[in-house]
């Protein structure tokens, strides 16, 4: 069984219409009380995939304290809360698998105007490796996915909001060594692999999927 959570009811409804076999639940993963209620109804969890994320644009000079706090709350604290709540169940069943969404803009490389975003994604790398090291004896694996630029609706919105959308799109493509963006399906395929028993000997690893951007 697969359960998808999101703070956006419209997103969940659309997802459920496309994939009617999955369960959906509205959840703010930055709210510990909501997380506790959600997981209280679930006895067994094989895989937890943390994919929530927020991108703040700007250097440290454009990053106010509220931007820093909001970015870390959404990108890092949400994972901390979700993992901490689910770990007792995984420890009890002596098996578990956690996948966290990081980015190549992290400890892997820097990118202009992604100051706090890169800091949060680097924190996720450390979080992932620490969980993997602490709970390996409980047969719990923890890995991270580090995408480059992915063609998603949010990416399309960013391009459309640019002063010159045509130029913005060309500039994005020009920065890609392979000459294209990643697809959401390619990221999902890596997540499925990490969630499967085929990756049973892999833990504590950050997996770049960036078309060569981090070379």
Task: Give, region by region, the residue ranges found by the protein language model.
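Short, flexible catalytic-loop segment of classical short-chain dehydrogenase/reductase
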Residues: 9, 147-157, 196
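Conserved NAD(P)H cofactor-binding loop of Rossmann-fold oxidoreductase domains
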Residues: 52-56
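Substrate-binding pocket helix/loop in short-chain dehydrogenase/reductase
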Residues: 59-60, 67-72, 172
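C-terminal substrate-recognition "lid" of short-chain dehydrogenase/reductases
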Residues: 80, 180-209, 214
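Active-site helix of classical SDR
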Residues: 83, 120, 128
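Alpha-helical segment proximal to the catalytic Tyr-Lys
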Residues: 88, 133-137, 200
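Residue(s) in the substrate-gating loop at a strand-loop-helix junction
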Residues: 103
